[in-house]
Amino acid sequence: MIRIATWNMKQAVAPKKPLPELWKWIESEIDPDVIVLTEARVPKDGLPDGWNGIWTPGGIGPRRTWGTIIAAREIELEEAKFKRNPKRIKEYIHPHPATLHTADILIDGDTWATIVGAYGFMPDSKNGWDAALGIVNECVDLLDSGNERVILAGDFNLWPKDILPVVENNLELVDIMGLVDDLPELKGAVGGSRIWTHKNGNSPNAARQELDFIFTTEELADEVVAVAGGIDDFPNAWDVSDHAPVIVDFK
């Protein structure tokens, strides 16, 4: 079994815990084999023992020293190489490459799947639409290369009602939370949210939002054995971040 996860570490504004504590929390509470971390930083001395990863040193820039990290334990990651559409790249060059990374997940030297770690960066707006085109273009090129084992994960800063049609219509990827039968209604939710992954403020009446997602190709969706996520599954997540993780286990 292999566990894939995504979690926002909350390093952009007012971090709640020191980095070493956050990495220990990842190991003890999420226990992933591979994880996409958004709004994330690597400790000053590098990744903790046993981890390897792909990220942009220094993050987005001097004022934003955080970004997206794809990290793994006991599994090798390799930056993915695939044929890109030159017309599409000319049409859209991602302005913040630190927020978007792509890696091959290697098991016993073979590529098990390719994972895209994405963050819906919001430099000039209140949601992730600014980044959505770049994320979709990255995945379109990857899927056009013939890869049938692709995972897209991260914090998109978009509600389900906005991001699901974009991903499903343009990429034909499967929303792993949609594989869960009989999800209970999330009271106080906005934007079609089904699980509470982002705490929008400290008010008891703050909107309950789902901003963190994992999508897969159909071939990988057939191998899913368990899905979990949100504050109900990670009840102490608010102690360390304003986001709760999402995880999926594959056979």
PLM feature segments, named:
Residues 58-62, 91-93, 152, 202-206, ...:
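Short Gly/Pro-enriched turn/cap motifs at secondary-structure boundaries
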Residues 10-12, 41-43, 76-77, 120-123, ...:
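Short, solvent-exposed loop/turn segments at secondary-structure junctions
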Residues 2-9, 23-45, 115, 138-164, ...:
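Active-site beta-strand/loop signature of hydrolases that rely on acidic residues for catalysis
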Residues 120-135, 160-172:
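Active-site-proximal segments of metal-dependent phosphoesterases and phosphodiesterases across multiple
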Residues 6-18, 124-128:
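Acidic/histidine-rich helix-loop elements
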Residues 6, 64-69, 95-102, 208-214, ...:
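Short hydrophobic/aromatic beta-strand or adjacent loop that forms the aromatic wall/cage
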Residues 34-120:
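Structured beta-strand-rich core segments of catalytic domains in phosphoester-bond hydrolases
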Residues 81, 145-147, 158-251:
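Metal-dependent phosphoester-hydrolase catalytic domains
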